[in-house]
Amino acid sequence: MAGALALNTYKTVSIAVTTGLTTAYTAPNGVSSIHLFSAVSNISSGVSTVTVYYNKSGTQFELIKNAKIPTTDVLNPIVGSLVLEVGDKIEIEGSANNAMKFTMSILESAK
């Protein structure tokens, strides 16, 4: 079947965290998305803070707010699975530009 969507696709998203709100992932049409793992690493020489949001239909829900991450440490902002429906987003913002990196693994399953 040409052009058929794979049944299960694993994806990893990695972005630099900035002071502006950034969308790390948006759940696409035609799949069910499940958050498997995420981590925010502080690559700076000082303490940084991060806020991670789940955005559903334009409404933000803070998953973790102003969490302090010591220098060269890592925070797992979303513990466990999180089901993302079409258009749902994971958004992130930090206390300084390029002081942290966010990595997230997602399983997309064809509907």
Please state what every model-predicted region is:
Residues 1-34, 94-111:
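C-terminal interaction-tip segments
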Residues 31, 73, 86-88:
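Surface-exposed loop/turn positions
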Residues 33-42, 89-92:
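A short beta-strand element within beta-rich, extracytoplasmic domains
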Residues 43-44, 96:
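Short, acidic/polar linear motifs in exposed loop/turn regions
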Residues 45-66:
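Short, surface-exposed beta-strand/strand-loop-strand elements in extracellular ectodomains
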Residues 67-74:
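Short proline/glycine- and polar residue-rich coil/turn motifs
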Residues 74-81:
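Exposed aromatic-hydrophobic patches
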Residues 82-96:
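Noncatalytic modules at the cell exterior or secretory-pathway interfaces
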